[in-house]
Every structure is written in C-alpha cells, then in structure tokens.
Design a protein with these regions (language model features):
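Short, solvent-exposed secondary-structure boundary motifs
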Residues: 1-3, 31, 43, 73-76
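Short aromatic-glycine-(Arg/Gly/Cys) micro-motifs in beta-strand/loop hairpins
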Residues: 2-23
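A cross-kingdom feature marking charged/low-complexity
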Residues: 4, 56-76
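Short beta-strand segments and strand-loop junctions that repeat across beta-rich extracellular domains
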Residues: 5-11, 51-58
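Surface loops and adjacent helix of pleckstrin homology
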Residues: 20, 29, 66
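Short, surface-exposed beta-strand-loop junctions and turns on beta-sheet-rich folds
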Residues: 23-25, 32, 69-70
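Intrinsically disordered, low-complexity proline/glycine-rich segments
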Residues: 24-27, 55
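A short, charged, amphipathic alpha-helix used as a generic interaction element across diverse proteins
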Residues: 27-45, 49
Length: 76
C-alpha cells in the first residue's frame, strides 16, 4: 500500500492539513498537527504506512510523526 502523507502548513496566517488533494483548515498549528497525527494513526491501524510532515516558516519540511515509530498519542 502507498504511504499516507499528511502535510501541515501555514497559509494566510491560518494552518491547514493537506491530504489526498484536500485541505482542512485550522486556527492553530497545534490543532492541525494533532488532527493530522490522529488521522495518520487511523490510517496506520488500517495497514497503511503513514507520515505527518510540518512545514517551517523557512519552507523546510520536517517529519513530525510516522506510524509505527512514534508514541501515540504524541506528547504535548
């Protein structure tokens, strides 16, 4: 199965999660990350590899969470 990727990025002062060609909008980065991790965890439980990536203010991407390698729920 293909890896499910969830991208958390800022746009116009708000945050969004992009997954499978759709955007989901949030007021805070923390909430966007939490929901992306929750969705990735559910995808992982259904047999998919899953990853959450977060874009910094410089445009660089970092891995926030991967299914099977990080604790769930994430701390914080």
């Amino acid at each position: 199965m293909a890896r499910m990727e969830y991208y958390v990025l800022s746009e116009g002062g708000r945050w969004k999660v992009r997954h499978d060609g759709k955007n989901y909008h949030y007021e805070t980065q923390a909430r966007a990350i939490r929901d992306a991790v929750d969705a990735a965890h559910q995808a992982g439980r259904m047999g998919h590899d899953a990853q959450v990536l977060v874009q910094s203010h410089t445009g660089a991407w970092r891995t926030e969470w991967t299914y099977g390698h990080d604790p769930y729920p994430p701390p914080g």
